[in-house]
Swiss-Prot record:
This is RNA polymerase II elongation factor ELL3. One of its GO terms (biological process) is stem cell proliferation. It is found in: Nucleus. Component of the little elongation complex (LEC), at least composed of ELL (ELL, ELL2 or ELL3), ZC3H8, ICE1 and ICE2. Component of the super elongation complex (SEC), at least composed of EAF1, EAF2, CDK9, MLLT3/AF9, AFF (AFF1 or AFF4), the P-TEFb complex and ELL (ELL, ELL2 or ELL3). Interacts with AFF4. Residues 129-177, 189-281 are annotated as: Disordered. Residues 283-393 form the OCEL domain. Keywords: Nucleus, Phosphoprotein, Transcription, Transcription regulation. PROSITE patterns: OCEL.
């Protein structure tokens, strides 16, 4: 992206029939996303992409870091009624004029920016965390830890998009990408109204929910639009607040209990399922926040969003940092065979750490549930605001 670019020159050759199963997109991304892509290319690891209609996420994996970016797919702007954009690449000829190949028309644009919901690895983002977050992390570094059991370094940040069947991807980085995301997490470029790339029938349904065009935004509006409409990232963390987790500290003397051993491994290694309310338990925010019909109502919703979002960020950092440790231990014990001395040593270590964790962070469960509740509430409010803006677009 840096440096001067030479002007394209040469003979033009038109190739308006792209290869089968090939889509041509205009890519817009900030410096952090570009560097992450370049790093993945150098380390030969594959990014993970997930679509949610005309929105989605890109995750760049690696040991010790994991960077999450959001993206939207929108329609490319056209110059005039008959204007358009074509994808052209230049082939430098050793002899004779250069050749310009037109691969086809660009109808969609992929805009990438850093996602707010990325949970940075605690050791990499320690300088960026608040004092309250550091206190929540300190449980794993203090106390009566038995000697001979070194601390496990974090391997990878929990993936908020992966299902419980997916495995972490390998990779490495010379510069922690989590720090790039922390520096760029408020970046959100201007963009055209969103468009769907699904079937025509699906596109008609999604056209009604496109985001309004954004020219200039206040900081709070940037933060509002940076919160993805997705499931809570905390739902992918280890389910250490389950009933099985409550039994770890009580059953530590039952060394021969295979059921308890299996229960322990399952609780640590398997991410918790999505917690959706039952039909009779309708969340209060669904009753309180309904469709927006006026600008004053929109402003009131945005004020409520900002108030809850400040609390959400604090809880998210505290809970994410504390849960990361058990996510790592869960992945570690899953790789060991049950009944082996190594498995037993790690199991005892987990029991001891969990007992210390409960003493140093007694409010973890309440804060975790509160954080997940706020995430769903903020996503709901954001959706209503964007829907109202879309209805008033162009009026």
């Amino acid at each position: 992206m840096e440096g001067t670019q030479e002007a394209l020159s040469g003979k033009m050759r038109l190739l308006f029939t792209p290869a089968a199963r090939t889509s041509l997109l205009m890519l817009r991304l900030n410096e952090a996303a570009l560097r992450a892509l370049q790093e993945c290319q150098q380390q030969q690891v594959r990014p993970v992409i997930a679509f949610q209609g005309h929105r989605g996420y890109l995750r760049f994996p690696g040991p010790g870091w994991s960077c999450l970016f959001s993206f939207i797919v929108s329609q490319c702007g056209q110059e005039g009624t008959n204007g358009g954009l074509d994808l052209v690449y230049q082939r430098l000829g050793r002899s004779g004029p250069n050749c310009l190949h037109c691969l086809g028309s660009l109808r969609e644009r992929l805009t990438i920016w850093a996602a707010m919901d990325t949970i940075p690895a605690p050791l990499l983002a320690q300088e960026h965390l608040t004092e309250g977050t550091r206190e929540s992390e300190s449980w794993q570094d203090t106390g009566d830890e038995p000697e001979g059991h070194p601390q496990l370094a974090p391997d990878e940040v929990s993936d908020p998009l992966a299902s419980h069947h997916e495995q972490s991807l390998p990779g490495s980085s010379s510069e922690p990408m989590a720090q790039w995301e922390m520096r760029n997490h408020t970046y959100l470029p201007s963009r055209e109204p969103d468009q769907s790339l699904l079937s025509p029938a699906s596109q008609k349904r999604l056209d009604k929910k496109r985001s309004a065009p954004i020219t200039t935004e206040e900081p709070e509006e940037k933060r509002l639009r940076a919160l993805p409409l997705a499931s809570s990232p905390l739902q992918g963390l280890a389910n250490q607040d389950s009933q099985e987790g409550e039994d770890w500290g009580q059953d530590e003397d039952e060394e021969g209990d295979e059921d308890g051993d299996s229960r322990l491994e399952q609780s640590l290694s398997a991410p918790s399922a999505s917690e959706s309310p039952s039909p009779e338990e309708v969340p209060d925010y669904l009753l309180q926040y309904r469709a927006i019909h006026s600008t004053e109502q929109q402003q009131a919703y945005e004020q409520d969003f900002e108030t809850d979002y400040a609390e959400y960020r604090i809880l998210h950092a505290r809970v994410g940092a504390a849960s990361q440790r058990f996510t790592e231990l869960g992945a570690e014990i899953k790789r060991l065979q049950r009944g082996t001395p190594e498995h037993k040593v790690l199991e005892d270590k987990i029991v001891q750490e969990y007992k210390k964790f409960r003493k140093r962070y007694p409010s973890y469960r309440e804060e975790k549930h509160r954080c997940e509740y706020l995430h769903q509430k903020l996503s709901h409010i954001k959706g209503l605001i964007l829907e109202f803006e879309e209805k008033n677009r162009g009026s």
